[in-house]
Amino acid sequence: MSLVSQNARHCSAEITADYGDGRGEIQATNASGSPTSMLVVDAPQCPQAPINSQCVNTSQAVQDPNDLEVLIDEQSRRLGALRVHDPLEDRSIALVNFMRMKSQTEGSIQQSEMLEFLREYSDQFPEILRRASAHLDQVFGLNLRVIDPQADTYNLVSKRGFQITDRIAESLDMPKASLLALVLGHILLNGNRAREASIWDLLLKVDMWDKPQRINNLFGNTRNLLTTDFVCMRFLEYWPVYGTNPLEFEFLWGSRAHREITKMEALKFVSDAHDEEPWSWPEEYNKALEGDKTKERSLTAGLEFWSEDTMNDKANDLVQLAISVTEEMLPIHQDELLAHTGKEFEDVFPNILNRATLILDMFYGLSLIEVDTSEHIYLLVQQPESEEEQVMLESLGRPTQEYVMPILGLIFLMGNRVKEANVWNLLRRFSVDVGRKHSITRKLMRQRYLECRPLSYSNPVEYELLWGPRAHHETIKMKVLEYMARLYRKRPQNWPEQYREAVEDEEARAKSEATIMFFLDPT
């Protein structure tokens, strides 16, 4: 088993242990490498599935004003459990939540209501309000505005610089959208990929986020929000970094972020957080301008270089390139890989490379390691196979109908792609040891019967399988459909959609063969 596979399983077990009861401590490594303990409050978990806009449990407006005090008391109880040492900071964060709830339910906030909420801290109201106003500005993108000086009435107004949140307002509330924009901008400043540790370091350095407790006070379980919720919504991708021990992870822009957010918007957002202008990073500024122009041209042409299918296709192309140079074991420069992928894919190249690296590791026993991070030079390393894996591969021999046809048939019946787990549920009927599944898949992929695509929105990463080029060359869909019909004791016509596709496939092949014969024998 590869190092990544072992660490991924270990990581999954740790996460389960840490969040099993919704409370506990997580260890986030900061930039210096030392662990930082962060207390975690209860947070709803996002389901592991292709997600619609309901995936993340965003803040909801309180419908019944009578419930407001209950919610505030619950929030205060949680804040008290965090043992924040500065009572004024405690109250300022609680006041932020109070003002947001009042704004959502009533549209305005009375100073008398805030004083009543603060109770014994009301004599410290000016300082608490100053801190709360700063938090609203820096995290939520909201200005606290006086709308009636005589009645001491306030409301919350969105800042002009936060238009980025408008397009994702249906999925995320303002603070989460702001956090996402900050992380996306940070990724942009780090060459379109950012280590997880650097994200935590950023959150701990940006103004009010100088204490881990405050991060979780405002966002709930922030680690789950970044590594699970934003991932399953496809705003972020979260991948292992190969060649690191212990295993590290990095964040990239997800396909939805590429589609809905411009690079200049993200750059402006993160520059505001650093009290800088976007052109303070001239290289990234120019790349953002060019990248947004390229994106506009591609949308006009009806192309999406960042779509999941396109990136997975390019990843499999890189896999085949890597396999072709395996015997030489020569270093590969990133420019060579990018040239093979296509210059137009430069912005999403890290996404493509991570997919290819994961496929190589899981199914080919190869590790693509960046041996020179400054020059971006990679080396393809053969992983030593355990004796058990060697026996499994040798025992499989040449793929037979016993394995190939059921897998190809299931893929065809499931819409020409199927999750790997579903394949092994089928093969249990053939008394196939599920423990051998990666060995079987590895064998079939090496022989080009199958292609593998990681599902970037899943954490831990799942895979789907498709027909490979050899399968398309050696068999036809009708033959596979007839095999599955015999297996299930049905007729091919019992799957009308697949039957129609198989007939069209036969007709297309016959037409192609006729055309070839015409040119070979024009007489």
Curated annotation (Swiss-Prot):
Q: Which GO terms describe its cellular component?
A: nucleus
What residue stretches are annotated with the MAGE domain?
88-288, 311-502
PROSITE patterns xrefs: MAGE
Q: Which UniProt keywords apply?
A: Repeat, Tumor antigen
By its UniProt entry, which Pfam families does this protein fall under? MAGE
Listed InterPro entries: MAGE, MAGE_WH1, MAGE_WH2, MHD_dom
The biological process GO terms on file are: negative regulation of transcription by RNA polymerase II
Lyase listed as a keyword: no
Stated name of the protein: Melanoma-associated antigen E2
* Underlying gene: MAGEE2
